[in-house]
Amino acid sequence: MRINFVLLITLILPWFVSGDSSEEAVDAPLDVKDDTGNKDYYKDSTGAYHFDKLIVTPLEYRDGESWKQSVIYCDLIFAKENKEEKGSFVKAQLKEDAEHPFIYRLLKLQTPLETYRGFIDGKNTEILDEIKSINLFEDFLSESLVPEISPSVNIPIDETALYCFIGIQETEPIRIPWPVLTVEFYGDAPPPESYFRTIKSTLLAISMFLGFITLTWLLRCIKSQSGVQPAQISLAFWVFIFVFTHSYQVYSMVAIGRGSFSTWYVVSFLFSLVFEEGLEQSAYTSFLLVLCFGLGITKPALVKYYVYLAFVAFVQGLFVTFAPLSYPVMSFYGVRGILLKLIWNIYTFVYYGLPFFAVYRLYKQAGESRKLGFEAKYSLLRTCYIALAAVTVSNCLFLGVVRPLLGSQLSLGFQLITSCITFVDFLVFAFLFDCSKFVFLKYQPIPFEWYALESMESLNLEPAPDRKV
């Protein structure tokens, strides 16, 4: 099941629970062992008990003589790619000495924007009614394990991602709340340590490359402010946001999946989870607008353009960040759902068509501007080929390098279909650009010096020989 609103509360819960249930609990010796005889655990400053990758946190209340604890188990699971084999699944089983039911739910960790798209596409809409009717955290945990009736369950997993098994258990009042169940994830064998070292080295190499570019542009800016273009600044900002958010998300997800449940990992992961899409897309849009307007490339960059870019980026960042978080309180049925889906599709396809328009503008300006030193003029057909090749290579690199590091799988066919749709949008943008440019040049007064210079060059006149007086 996919939901992020309750998941955020669930992950934050162990670090903010302030109740102390040990005051009235019956003291037990510290060497209490579970069924397997394992006593490896530790207690953090918030009162949560860590058993390998499983966290047990005493809650602030009790039901009769039984104490309740929240249980969280998170792991990075790699789904099996071989369809002939048995698929990946999660197995949860109560221990033999369990006396009370255990309520639970399995959550797949993903960004709010991905969940938002799923709701608009008609996926997991049944969770909306559950969220609106939730009064307690226990109401969200719809499934249960009952001793001697249904003590175990197998939950299938179809995608590689970070999964969290959450629930509430009831135990007798003892000092150490041992887990009453065992949770095991079955999938492809986890990668060796070299895989995680590769992730760290890749992120380090990208960060060093970005730092070198940023430092170079900073020195150029200090030496000569006219030597740095707005396109370079916006590109550096976008790449910095991309590397920062994805690096923290990947590293935190790997750390959480390996059992390192520190506060820093959780806070950084939640920050990148919520604000990643908004920051990255707003920075990317600013870069595209700088290219489309030609700021600092073919015309001077005025202050009003920067104000406009900042306003557009701010509005888009708010929309992408907070609009997905509104699905728990909104109803996507009826007219409101149709209108929301229409707006979202227009935003998606028009937004992803902007890069083609930016490429077209760059090549047209490169062919017409003397400042860049290009004399050859690029035809529309050649520009289209370059744009289509660029988006294909970008999608392949994105699917082959970035997404595997994030632990998710996307369809290459879907990305290619999206590329074709955005390619058509690019042609429309290019046609509108040619029309607008023709109208602009038709009614724009032409300076005399520029007109005279172009006229002299078009006539190919040779200078007259000097006459002797």
From Swiss-Prot:
Topological category with respect to the lipid bilayer: Multi-pass membrane protein
Keywords, sorted A to Z: Membrane, Signal, Transmembrane, Transmembrane helix
Regions that span the bilayer: 199-219, 236-256, 283-303, 305-325, 338-358, 386-406, 413-433
Primary subcellular site in the record, as a coarse category: membrane
GO cellular component: membrane
Entry annotated with the keyword rRNA processing: no
Localization, UniProt: Membrane
Signal sequence residues: 1-19
Protein name: Uncharacterized membrane protein C61.05
Organism, as annotated: Schizosaccharomyces pombe (strain 972 / ATCC 24843) (Fission yeast)
